[in-house]
Amino acid sequence: MALSKEDILNAIAEMSVMDVVELVEAMEEKFGVSAAAAVAVAAPAAGDAGAAAAEEQTEFDVVLASAGEKKVNVIKAVRAITGLGLKEAKAMVDGAPSTVKEALSKDDAEAAKKELEEAGATVELK
């Protein structure tokens, strides 16, 4: 009769710490694995995720949150930044929040944000 996982866990829970250590060593020897290696591999994976999030973002999206009071000036700025026609630029401004440009470098995104804000828009970089 095979033991269930629950039975095995209950048996381990009743063992002393020394018995558990001996059990782990016996399992490592029998199956040719190392519990320390599994922990060492898992730890950097979690660290890499945090490091990736901590790295500086290199691509930015310029998002028009709202046109503000000077809608005509914002439409002109959107046309200048995107190269869109009047109808498309107006639709983008009317549909705010909307993404004006995607995947820009930090400098280009800051320049576009500054131009739109000077025209009266509220802008976010994502």
Curated annotation (Swiss-Prot):
Key words, A-Z: Ribonucleoprotein, Ribosomal protein
Domain of life of the organism encoding this protein: Bacteria
Pfam families reported for this sequence: Ribosomal_L12, Ribosomal_L12_N
Keyword Ribonucleoprotein included in the entry's annotation: yes
Sections of the chain in a coiled coil: none
CDD domains, sorted: Ribosomal_L7_L12
GO cellular component, one term: cytosolic large ribosomal subunit
GO terms of molecular function: mRNA binding; structural constituent of ribosome
Record flagged with keyword Ribonucleoprotein: yes
Gene Ontology BP, a term: translation
Family under the similarity heading: Belongs to the bacterial ribosomal protein bL12 family.
Subunit and interaction comment: Homodimer. Part of the ribosomal stalk of the 50S ribosomal subunit. Forms a multimeric L10(L12)X complex, where L10 forms an elongated spine to which 2 to 4 L12 dimers bind in a sequential fashion. Binds GTP-bound translation factors.
HAMAP family for this protein: Ribosomal_bL12 (MF_00368)
Task of the protein: Forms part of the ribosomal stalk which helps the ribosome interact with GTP-bound translation factors. Is thus essential for accurate translation.
Name this polypeptide is given: Large ribosomal subunit protein bL12
